[in-house]
Amino acid sequence: ISYSGEVADCGEVSLRRLSMRIDLLNKAEGLTITKVTFRNRAVKSRLFTPNAMLAEPGAVEDKEYPDLNLVGSFDVPAEYKSKIYGYENLSRRGEATVPTLDIEYTYLDQPYTHTVEFLDRNDPEGLAPLALKRNYLYRITVGRKVEPEFGIEVVDWTNEKSFNVDDITF
């Protein structure tokens, strides 16, 4: 309804989430994830898609997800889904707000910490941070052939279909 009271059909309205999500899957036998810390988790956003990271105080925080007990199993992976959220993080290389995920785990009864860096595979040097975009799910799978391996998969949040990062509009 307009200001003058006239009714008009504006067509379909497509809504998108303002947040992004990170899920963990542990397929590594003998490895137990005990804690996750999301470093530089964006806690503020804009209604419209920004072109750069918010540069105001309090835009990011470190958030801990303690007391996890994700026991690895190849046949039935331990999942930590729909618990880690944040807003877009468009930080560029060298900025203090580049996001990472510290995964604390035990492997063969020894404690370890692995830092997952979200890096753009299309960057020739492999050093450019991957923009964590709204409305996407970032799935981190922990596996093991000989040593523990950490892989990142970016999928559509709604239908969980894979796509190329090139397809994300910036």
For the regions a protein language model found, what residue spans apply to each?
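Long, acidic/polar, low-complexity amphipathic helices and coiled-coil-like
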Residues: 1-23
